[in-house]
A protein has these predicted regions:
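Extracellular glycoside hydrolase catalytic/binding regions
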Residues: 1-95, 99-100, 108-139
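Non-catalytic accessory regions flanking glycosidase/transglycosidase catalytic cores in CAZymes
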Residues: 135-158
């Protein structure tokens, strides 16, 4: 069933990374977003180039999964690459969802594994990835406020 009043997120091949390929033959609907997944320590210029191609071709993109570690969820926390990604997303009005809000003992988790609170977290409860994410959200609050003030059902990138 087609839901014209709803936003539909469409995956792309190769773990939702081939948005450039999808942009060459997009589905002709106005309420679709194409999913992109990235992990900042693993996916760098090559995937950013694919995103830029998709945007140039007018494809509406939503990052439905990202982290600032390696794609495994472990390894280094790459804030430099993460900052580059956030700049690209913010400059192009692309929304995103971080993976993952948990206290699992892995680098991509936003909470430290020692955190047992279900809410009301202190800054020290956040993992290094979580501290970066929290600061990023606070530093870019004005961008998000502007985006929330002007929602649209037409998802096409302009």
């Amino acid at each position: 069933m087609y839901a014209p009043q709803s936003i539909v997120i469409v995956g792309t091949p190769t773990w939702s990374q081939d948005v450039d390929i999808a942009s060459s033959s997009p589905i002709e609907r106005t309420n679709l977003l194409y999913s992109l997944h990235f992990y900042a320590a693993t996916h760098k210029e090559d995937l950013q180039s694919k995103l830029q191609t998709a945007l140039t071709n007018g494809l509406p993109v939503f990052v439905s999964e990202f982290g600032i570690t390696e794609a495994s969820g472990s390894g280094i926390v790459d804030t430099t690459s993460a900052d580059t990604w956030m700049k690209l997303l913010n400059e192009n009005g692309i929304g995103y969802i971080y993976w993952n809000l948990s206290n699992k003992d892995e680098a991509c988790a936003l909470l430290r594994s020692s955190c047992t609170s279900l809410s009301d977290w202190t800054f020290d409860d956040y993992s290094p990835a979580g501290q970066w994410f929290l600061q990023n959200q606070q530093n870019n609050a004005s961008i998000y406020d502007k985006a929330a003030a002007a929602p649209t059902a037409d998802c096409r990138h302009s």
